[in-house]
Amino acid sequence: MIELKGKPVADDIKERAIKRVEELRSQGIIPKIATIRVGDDPGDIAYEHGICSRAEEMGIDIKQKVFAGNISQERLLAKIAAYNEDQDIHGVLIFRPLPKQFDDKTICKALDFRKDVDGITTGSMAGVFTGSGEGFPPCTAEACIRMLDYYGYDLTGKKVTVFGRSLVIGKPVTVMALDRNATVTICHSRTTPEVLREAGKNADVLITAVGRANFLTRDLTGEDQIILDVGINDDGAGGICGDVDPQAASAAAAASPVPGGVGSVTTAVLMEHVVTAAARSALQEK
């Protein structure tokens, strides 16, 4: 089994983006991302640290805002509005899921889609589903496609099965695979066991984003498949694991590990989106 590691993919994206950052800085444009975190979720904090490190490596400025977990929705909306108006900020990332007192749709709708570098707004989603190129796709969904591209897997004519139908990964990665001329089946919580097994065994590429440890067992997979594991789960021993059972992964032709796979590409894609947003902003100002 070939291990599809994320680091070389992330490094390739980073190197290309750094050249663009240098070009923008030579024009007096400094790419900048603002992050908004509500509360002290350990996962959010870890992701935030990763963003800070990556931004520093790439010459991207970052502005961090942390709110207590009990703030009102009005305060959060006010901060988003301020960042929408700040011309020095090119991208805004809101750590989600938010605490229960927030209406997620209202928060996402409040963000200017031109600064939506993680694809959470309807404007960005429309760009993904119509192929208009407006906004940005969700970073993790794009990371899946970028990994396949980097390792030379052409999806043209291939059968792809996606496990999970969220707006963050499942639905957008389905559309992005279709755009690369794949035939895509999407499975979800209401898919019958028989259909689930058939869809898993008959695919050339499997992408799983269910969020359940060992979900994708060997009896759901076929032979000589490519598996991208997007799941991040508690392994019960203080670490993390993906959705793919080890036996299923070892039987694949190639599979991404967790950790060290798709997740490590996500932050690089996010930074690339910030750079692109900065370049677009510069063109609009001319």
Q: What is each of the regions a protein language model found here?
A:
Residues M1-I29:
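Positively charged, low-complexity intrinsically disordered leader regions
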Residues I30-G39:
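Short beta-strand segments enriched in small/hydrophobic residues
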Residues V38-C52, G135-I226, G238-A248:
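Glycine-rich phosphate/diphosphate-binding loop of Rossmann-like nucleotide-binding domains
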Residues A55-G69, V184-C187:
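Short beta-strand elements in bilobed, periplasmic/extracellular small-molecule ligand-binding domains
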Residues R75-Q87:
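Short, well-structured alpha-helical segments in soluble
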Residues G91-L155, R197:
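Anion-binding alpha/beta catalytic cores of soluble intermediary-metabolism enzymes, centered on
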Residues P97, A209-R212, G231-I232:
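Short glycine-/small-residue-rich Rossmann-like dinucleotide-binding loops
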Residues K105-M125, L228-A282:
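Rossmann-fold NAD(P)-binding glycine/threonine-rich loop
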